[in-house]
C-alpha cells in the first residue's frame, strides 16, 4: 500500500490549475467530466449501453454550461483513445476534435488501459499487495481481450495488445507476482485462470472522471495530439460480423 500511495502523490505533483473536459466512450459506458486542479466539478455517466451518439453531445453541454456558469475558461479537452469499441472510440474522438478545434484548445489523448489502471491505483479501499501488477482487460470478441500488464509506475511490462486467452496467458507475470485483473474482459478470464496469484477486481469500467491524473500530467508536459491527424488506438483491424443465415449453414 505504501508504494501505491507514493505513486498517487507523484501524480498529484503534476496537477495544474487547468480546466479540462474529459470524454470516454471506449466501452458501453458513455461519460464526461469537467475538472480543475484535479477536482471533479461536473460529471455525467450512462451505463445502459451503446447510446453514445445520442447522449454525448448533451453530456458535453452540461459540463460546458457548468464551466460557463462559474466563469471558467476551458484549457483542454481529453479523450480516451482506446483500445475499446470501434464505434464508441470514433464517436468520442470526433466530438473531442470538433470541440478542441472550435474552442482553440489543445487535445489530450488518454490510453484506455492506463485509464483503467489509474482507477484501481487510486482506489485506496482495495487492499492490494505492494508488488501487485495491474492487468486491465477489455472484452474484444470470443476469448479475445485488449490487455496489457503494468507495474506500480504505470510502466507497461506487456505492451497493449489483443490477446486470445488460454490457461497459459499471463503465466510469466503470475509466476512471481500478484496480478490484479479487472475490466469487462476479466469475466471470461476468471473461470479459466486458476492461479493463486491472480486477484480479480470487480466493477471496473473506463470513466471520464478517472482520467484526471493522466490528463493533468499530459497537460503539464505539453503532450497534445494533432487534431487533424490523430486516430483511435484500435490495436486490431475492424472485423465485420457476418449475419447468420436463416437457413443455417451447409
Cite the ranges covered by each PLM segment.
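Phosphate-handling active-site elements
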Residues: 65-74, 100-110, 125-129
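Acyltransferase
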Residues: 201-250
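Surface "functional belts" at beta-alpha junctions
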Residues: 12-16, 39, 51, 106-206, ...
Amino acid at each position: 500500500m505504501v508504494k501505491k500511495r507514493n505513486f498517487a502523490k507523484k501524480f498529484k505533483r503534476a496537477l495544474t490549475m487547468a480546466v479540462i473536459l474529459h470524454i470516454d466512450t471506449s466501452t458501453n459506458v458513455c461519460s464526461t467530466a469537467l475538472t480543475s486542479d484535479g477536482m471533479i466539478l461536473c460529471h455525467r455517466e450512462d451505463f445502459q449501453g451503446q447510446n453514445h451518439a445520442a447522449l454525448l453531445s448533451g453530456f458535453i453541454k452540461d459540463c460546458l454550461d457548468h464551466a460557463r456558469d462559474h466563469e471558467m475558461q476551458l484549457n483542454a479537452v481529453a479523450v480516451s483513445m482506446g483500445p475499446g469499441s470501434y464505434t464508441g472510440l470514433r464517436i468520442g474522438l470526433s466530438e473531442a476534435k470538433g470541440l478542441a478545434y472550435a474552442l482553440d484548445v489543445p487535445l489530450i489523448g488518454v490510453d484506455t488501459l492506463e485509464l483503467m489502471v489509474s482507477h484501481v491505483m487510486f482506489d485506496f479501499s482495495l487492499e492490494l499487495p505492494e508488488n501487485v501488477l495491474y492487468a486491465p482487460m477489455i472484452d474484444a470478441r470470443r476469448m479475445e481481450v485488449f490487455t496489457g500488464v503494468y507495474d506500480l509506475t504505470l510502466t507497461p511490462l506487456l505492451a497493449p495488445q489483443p490477446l486470445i486467452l488460454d490457461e497459459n496467458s499471463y503465466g510469466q507475470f503470475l509466476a512471481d507476482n500478484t496480478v490484479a485483473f479487472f475490466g469487462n474482459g476479466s469475466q471470461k478470464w476468471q473461470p479459466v485462470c486458476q492461479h493463486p496469484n491472480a486477484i480479480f477486481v470487480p466493477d471496473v469500467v473506463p470513466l471520464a472522471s478517472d482520467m484526471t491524473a493522466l490528463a493533468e500530467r499530459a497537460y503539464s508536459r505539453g503532450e497534445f495530439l494533432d487534431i487533424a491527424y490523430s486516430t483511435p488506438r484500435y490495436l486490431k483491424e475492424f472485423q465485420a460480423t457476418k449475419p447468420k443465415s436463416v437457413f443455417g449453414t451447409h
